[in-house]
């Protein structure tokens, strides 16, 4: 597999192969509080080269998005920056279910794009509130 620091990593495993191997730790009821999603594509699962970080379907395979804090890997990695602007990556990550977006290539561009997406209805305020509530919940729970 490629290194997502320099290119998009791709797995050609099927959903069943992933569920029976790589995803086994996520299937166990371990009380997982947070998970970092990497920039890996699984075209045999979702039919495209969309990185897991930007795919609601792939994120759903590894987490209970309602209770698990979903964190992106760095959005400044080449796996993202070669194909997406900072704004596109930020919007798609939020739409996919990510709660914390790490290190976009340009924070002002990512912020402005998300703000515009909320203002034009592409992202609902309720969606951002959901992430905000999860972050606050875990900050309280762990006294951070």
Descriptions of predicted regions:
Residues 119-144:
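Mid-to-C-terminal alpha-helical segments outside catalytic/metal-binding sites
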């Amino acid at each position: 597999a490629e290194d997502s620091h320099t290119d998009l990593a791709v797995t050609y495993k099927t959903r069943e192969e992933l569920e029976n191997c790589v995803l086994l730790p996520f299937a166990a009821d371990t009380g997982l509080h947070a998970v970092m999603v990497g920039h890996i594509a699984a075209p045999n699962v979702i039919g495209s080269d969309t990185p897991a970080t930007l795919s609601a379907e792939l994120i759903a395979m590894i987490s209970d998005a309602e209770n698990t804090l979903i964190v992106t890997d760095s959005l400044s990695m080449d796996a993202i920056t070669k194909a997406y602007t900072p704004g596109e990556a930020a919007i798609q990550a939020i739409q996919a279910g990510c709660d914390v977006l790490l290190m976009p290539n340009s924070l002002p561009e990512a912020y402005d794009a998300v703000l515009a997406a909320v203002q034009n209805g592409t992202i609902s305020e309720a969606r951002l509130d959901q992430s905000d509530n999860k972050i606050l919940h875990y900050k309280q729970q762990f006294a951070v």
